[in-house]
């Protein structure tokens, strides 16, 4: 009911920034209220999505050491695209979301960048291969350290971050496959699969 009232009062843009997990539902409601019919082109573009980001939800990579709460989140980086960038990369940069590892892994089984998987498959490991072979993006890791009361808001621009090295010196070690922090362009065969 709150969302419905908000739609009529014109505050949807504000709500959407908080409710990423209901993005598809809200898009459908907007289309319904606007009476939009999907064209063939818009149906194609629906295969490019940015996934659901829940940066303040619990992650397997979160931990507490000596009363300090540590969290690792990831952003699609660099925050720039070119004229030749893929639609997926453009949408990821534009969305400017902060993801947990689990959010990104969930995209591996969803159609978010159709056709870039092995043999043209619609799904593949976004965690390892981002926008697909030749992509210029990677997952940039951000380590947050919260002290005091509360859970810590990773979406806040004032959220305290520390370097990965500092976190490791304090006992917070998170290990990922090396490909997570690599651009597919810098991988063997530029991230493409040899057949």
Predicted regions and their residues:
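Domain-core detector
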Residues: 1-134, 139-195
